[in-house]
Amino acid sequence: MTRINSGFFFCAGEWKRPEIRVDVYEVTGKWRDEVWRPFAKHHYLDHNLNRTARQFVGVYDGQVVAHTGVIQFPMRTGWKRIHRLVVLPDYQGVGIGVRFINAVAALVASEGYNVNLTTTTPALVGALKHSEDWALVRKGVVKMGDLKDRPYASAKRLGAADSSMRPTFSFNYRP
């Protein structure tokens, strides 16, 4: 379990963040599909979760408020990728997402892996750019023509979601 501080309150003439405890759990077994279901509709690319993903949830006050998966980074030995990060809308904007993925990334890094996250979400990009825990390693727009010779191009032809024509930002976790 990992403690996460977030949120705001006004005290003595300045804004301060109250402590919000969010516990992080790895989800295993039969609960995998059930846990992802309420988050699926809030993900900007599609509603699918990689079947091989390790799943983690953030729980605040008895409510599951955040979800992410961790998958093998394609074609890169020793690397894992944060996959399908979602914070429920009522809990967005107070720092839960970044602290949640920091806790998950720290766990994965402690297992000997490098960790990557690629996103197009402006708020997450801004937060990670200002974080000492993440290094921006790539930014740009992926064009469909760039994908045609790659092994996963067939997945796109079958209707898989992608970030083509969106500004994307890729970050590496630095423990």
Indicate residue ranges for each PLM-predicted region.
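A conserved beta-strand-loop-helix scaffold within acyl/acetyltransferase catalytic domains
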Residues: 25-91
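Conserved acetyl-CoA-binding loop-helix of GNAT-fold acetyltransferases
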Residues: 87, 92-106
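Conserved GNAT acetyl-CoA-binding A-motif
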Residues: 106-123
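A short acidic (Asp/Glu
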Residues: 126-130
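Conserved catalytic-core motifs of GNAT/GCN5-like acyltransferases
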Residues: 134-157
